[in-house]
Amino acid sequence: SPDGEYAEETGLEKEQIVVLRRAFDSFDRDKKGYISPETVSDILRMMGIKVSSTSFKQIIEEIDEDGSGQIEFSEFLQLAAKFLIEEDEEAMMKELKEAFRLYDKEGNGYITTQTLKEILHELDARLTAEELVGIIEEIDEDGSGTVDFDEFMAMMTG
Protein backbone atom coordinates (compact mmCIF):
# COMPACT_ATOMS: atom_id res chain seq x y z
CA SER A 1 0.00 0.00 0.00
CA PRO A 2 1.21 3.54 -0.62
CA ASP A 3 0.71 4.30 3.08
CA GLY A 4 3.14 1.52 3.96
CA GLU A 5 5.73 3.03 1.65
CA TYR A 6 5.14 6.47 3.13
CA ALA A 7 5.62 5.00 6.61
CA GLU A 8 9.03 3.67 5.59
CA GLU A 9 10.08 6.92 3.93
CA THR A 10 8.99 9.23 6.72
CA GLY A 11 9.20 7.14 9.90
CA LEU A 12 5.57 7.97 10.69
CA GLU A 13 3.12 5.39 12.01
CA LYS A 14 0.52 4.14 9.52
CA GLU A 15 -2.26 5.52 11.75
CA GLN A 16 -0.64 8.96 11.65
CA ILE A 17 -0.50 8.77 7.87
CA VAL A 18 -4.21 7.90 7.68
CA VAL A 19 -5.07 10.91 9.86
CA LEU A 20 -2.83 13.18 7.79
CA ARG A 21 -4.34 11.85 4.56
CA ARG A 22 -7.82 12.73 5.87
CA ALA A 23 -6.73 16.22 6.85
CA PHE A 24 -5.05 16.72 3.48
CA ASP A 25 -8.07 15.45 1.52
CA SER A 26 -10.54 17.55 3.48
CA PHE A 27 -8.60 20.69 2.52
CA ASP A 28 -7.92 19.57 -1.04
CA ARG A 29 -11.61 19.99 -1.88
CA ASP A 30 -11.14 20.11 -5.64
CA LYS A 31 -8.98 16.97 -5.50
CA LYS A 32 -6.07 18.72 -7.19
CA GLY A 33 -3.56 16.62 -5.27
CA TYR A 34 -1.97 19.58 -3.52
CA ILE A 35 -2.70 22.26 -0.92
CA SER A 36 -1.25 25.69 -0.23
CA PRO A 37 1.43 26.36 2.39
CA GLU A 38 -1.14 28.46 4.32
CA THR A 39 -3.40 25.42 4.51
CA VAL A 40 -0.51 23.30 5.76
CA SER A 41 0.09 25.82 8.51
CA ASP A 42 -3.62 25.61 9.49
CA ILE A 43 -3.47 21.82 9.64
CA LEU A 44 -0.37 21.91 11.84
CA ARG A 45 -2.07 24.37 14.18
CA MET A 46 -5.10 22.10 14.41
CA MET A 47 -2.79 19.26 15.36
CA GLY A 48 -1.43 21.40 18.19
CA ILE A 49 1.93 21.92 16.52
CA LYS A 50 3.26 25.43 17.05
CA VAL A 51 5.73 26.73 14.52
CA SER A 52 7.18 30.19 14.02
CA SER A 53 6.59 31.78 10.61
CA THR A 54 10.33 31.98 9.92
CA SER A 55 11.03 28.33 10.50
CA PHE A 56 7.81 27.45 8.67
CA LYS A 57 8.99 29.36 5.58
CA GLN A 58 12.33 27.57 5.67
CA ILE A 59 10.66 24.20 5.99
CA ILE A 60 8.27 24.91 3.11
CA GLU A 61 11.22 25.88 0.90
CA GLU A 62 12.97 22.66 1.86
CA ILE A 63 9.89 20.47 1.35
CA ASP A 64 8.48 22.06 -1.82
CA GLU A 65 10.99 20.16 -3.92
CA ASP A 66 9.53 21.08 -7.29
CA GLY A 67 9.23 24.75 -6.30
CA SER A 68 5.56 24.77 -7.32
CA GLY A 69 4.49 26.79 -4.29
CA GLN A 70 1.98 23.99 -3.69
CA ILE A 71 2.42 21.12 -1.29
CA GLU A 72 1.71 17.63 -2.62
CA PHE A 73 0.70 14.87 -0.20
CA SER A 74 4.16 13.27 -0.07
CA GLU A 75 5.71 16.68 0.65
CA PHE A 76 3.06 17.31 3.30
CA LEU A 77 3.93 14.00 4.99
CA GLN A 78 7.63 14.85 5.11
CA LEU A 79 6.78 18.14 6.72
CA ALA A 80 4.42 16.62 9.29
CA ALA A 81 7.01 13.95 10.07
CA LYS A 82 9.54 16.64 10.99
CA PHE A 83 7.24 17.93 13.71
CA LEU A 84 5.69 14.69 14.92
CA ILE A 85 8.96 12.80 15.19
CA GLU A 86 10.82 15.69 16.83
CA GLU A 87 8.05 15.87 19.43
CA ASP A 88 8.53 12.17 20.18
CA GLU A 89 12.25 12.71 20.64
CA GLU A 90 11.63 15.64 22.97
CA ALA A 91 9.21 13.57 25.01
CA MET A 92 11.79 10.80 25.25
CA MET A 93 14.48 13.26 26.34
CA LYS A 94 12.16 14.52 29.07
CA GLU A 95 11.46 11.00 30.30
CA LEU A 96 15.14 10.15 30.35
CA LYS A 97 15.91 13.35 32.26
CA GLU A 98 13.27 12.46 34.83
CA ALA A 99 14.54 8.90 35.14
CA PHE A 100 18.06 10.21 35.62
CA ARG A 101 16.94 12.74 38.22
CA LEU A 102 15.09 10.05 40.11
CA TYR A 103 18.27 8.02 40.51
CA ASP A 104 20.57 11.01 41.01
CA LYS A 105 19.13 11.50 44.50
CA GLU A 106 21.84 13.87 45.70
CA GLY A 107 21.49 15.97 42.56
CA ASN A 108 25.18 15.63 41.74
CA GLY A 109 24.61 15.41 38.02
CA TYR A 110 25.78 11.80 37.87
CA ILE A 111 24.78 8.32 38.98
CA THR A 112 27.02 5.43 39.98
CA THR A 113 27.59 2.56 37.59
CA GLN A 114 25.99 0.35 40.25
CA THR A 115 22.79 2.40 40.01
CA LEU A 116 22.99 2.23 36.23
CA LYS A 117 23.20 -1.57 36.44
CA GLU A 118 19.94 -1.55 38.41
CA ILE A 119 18.27 0.72 35.83
CA LEU A 120 19.42 -1.48 32.95
CA HIS A 121 18.25 -4.59 34.76
CA GLU A 122 14.82 -3.01 35.25
CA LEU A 123 14.67 -2.09 31.57
CA ASP A 124 15.70 -5.56 30.43
CA ALA A 125 15.70 -8.37 32.97
CA ARG A 126 17.27 -10.75 30.42
CA LEU A 127 20.65 -9.01 30.52
CA THR A 128 23.31 -11.25 32.05
CA ALA A 129 25.88 -9.98 34.56
CA GLU A 130 28.56 -10.13 31.83
CA GLU A 131 26.42 -8.13 29.42
CA LEU A 132 25.80 -5.51 32.09
CA VAL A 133 29.51 -5.18 32.79
CA GLY A 134 30.15 -4.85 29.05
CA ILE A 135 27.56 -2.10 28.70
CA ILE A 136 28.88 -0.26 31.75
CA GLU A 137 32.47 -0.39 30.49
CA GLU A 138 31.34 1.05 27.17
CA ILE A 139 29.51 3.93 28.83
CA ASP A 140 31.89 4.71 31.65
CA GLU A 141 34.74 5.34 29.25
CA ASP A 142 36.90 7.12 31.80
CA GLY A 143 36.41 4.34 34.37
CA SER A 144 35.26 6.86 36.97
CA GLY A 145 32.55 4.57 38.33
CA THR A 146 30.01 7.30 37.63
CA VAL A 147 27.89 8.18 34.62
CA ASP A 148 26.83 11.75 33.92
CA PHE A 149 23.63 12.71 32.12
CA ASP A 150 25.30 13.07 28.71
CA GLU A 151 26.81 9.59 28.95
CA PHE A 152 23.43 8.27 30.10
CA MET A 153 21.64 9.98 27.19
CA ALA A 154 24.15 8.70 24.66
CA MET A 155 23.57 5.18 25.91
CA MET A 156 19.77 5.39 25.91
CA THR A 157 19.44 7.02 22.50
CA GLY A 158 22.47 5.50 20.77
From Swiss-Prot:
Residues 15-50, 51-86, 91-126, 127-158 form the EF-hand domain. Gene3D superfamilies: EF-hand. One of its GO terms (cellular component) is myosin II complex. The modification N-acetylserine is found at S1. Signal peptide: none annotated. It comes from the Eukaryota. Ca(2+) 2 binds at D140, D142, S144, T146, E151. Keywords: Acetylation, Calcium, Metal-binding, Muscle protein, Repeat. There are two different troponin C in barnacle. Belongs to the troponin C family. This is Troponin C, isoform 1. The lineage of its organism: Eukaryota, Metazoa, Ecdysozoa, Arthropoda, Crustacea.
